[in-house]
Amino acid sequence: MSKPLRILYAVGPEDVIEAYNYWIKGLDAPSQVSVTFSSQFYEVCKTLDAQGYVIAQSNKFEKVQDDRFIIERRPVPWSPGALYHLRQIYCGLSLLASALRFRANVVVADSGTTYWFVLSLFSWLGITVIPSLHCMLWCKYLPLRLVDKLNLSLSRNLFASDCKAILVASQDIAKQISQLTCGKHQPILEFFSSYRRSDFANIPEPSPPSPMRVLFAGRVEQNKGVFDLLEIAKGFATEGKDIIFDICGEGSALEPLRQAAIQAGVERSFICHGYCSKPQMRSMFAQCHVVIVPTRTDFIEGFNRVVCESILSGRPVVTSAVCPALSYVADAVVEVPPNDVQAYGDALVKLLCDRQLYEQKRLACQVVQEQFYDPTKSWGAALKSILLT
């Protein structure tokens, strides 16, 4: 582009100020196992001598500014029911107003920051748009609701013509874009989450499984399958199986899940740890034998970084095709049907009892993990390549 780049980046609930404060010191934020997307954005702006304006969703307002960046965390009000749709449109219009005040000539917008069709307004006003999709456009196992059909219909033009290129976290997302646009869309660039090899160096091989430890990491929500895990744990306790579940992460279901485990009398084998920092997560990956990702069909999973982190830690994964990451690491995964609680439990027992299968899956982790260390496949590298064309 001939004009100096002025890029607005709209991101979800990432702590972009924490990431910035560590980035300027040449460090990664300790709150995330992967390299944050905002720190990759800062690096791209620095490399291209661009001005950057980062707006993240938050529960409180914060702002920092220097010669190159304006970085804000903006509160997003909770809006139930139909008000949610109005809020999403309002958030998009608010981003548009900020982009105009900043005199942005490029806007990069993540999933969830507004409805996709609102971004066409930016394009009509001469601002280059780069949508960054971390989630599926719709739940691939469920029928579309009327409101979803309307939203997608309105969003078709953005992907077909009103953007410069499209960043996607998986091929499953790319396929949905192609389906939505009947194959007539702007260039699609796939990216992986980025990891430092040093963060996974010297993680020991799994100890003998006595007890077997199963790790869940991520948002603690019903649609992430956490209550399915509790049902499995209750069944294992009744059968006397020596299997412990470690639940790591925050979410609206954390306290209800913890209380349900106590009421069921399985709190010693179903441990809710809450939020865990990067060093704590390293310890959790090191002590576990298997990582489980039981996302249910009513969640629009885009990839699931925990699958990457499990593979990089040398731990097999149990998951279903709801998780698009499966196709990238299939040799290191035991696949089960979506939402099948019994099948998840059976898969864990099989890995516990069949040492040959477990070793086969564990060794496969070493084969498939290299793709996640490739810097040319990072979000930042994909964004930079778009900006340079």
Language-model segments: residues:
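A conserved mid-protein helix/loop that constitutes part of the nucleotide-sugar donor-binding site
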Residues: T36, M212, F216-G235, S252-E255, ...
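Membrane-proximal helix-turn-helix segments that form the acceptor-binding/catalytic region
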Residues: S38-E43, L93-L100, L146-I166
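Short His-centered aromatic/hydrophobic patch
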Residues: A109-Y115, L133
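Donor nucleotide-sugar binding/catalytic pocket of nucleotide-sugar-dependent glycosyltransferases
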Residues: R156-N202, C272, G302
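Nucleotide-activated donor-binding/catalytic signature segment of Leloir-type glycosyltransferases, i.e.
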Residues: R258-C276
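Acidic donor-binding loop of glycosyltransferase active sites
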Residues: A286-I300, R315
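Short hydrophobic beta-strand element within catalytic cores of glycosyltransferases
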Residues: L312, P316-T319
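Conserved acidic donor-binding segment of nucleotide-sugar-dependent glycosyltransferases
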Residues: D331-Q342, K350-R355
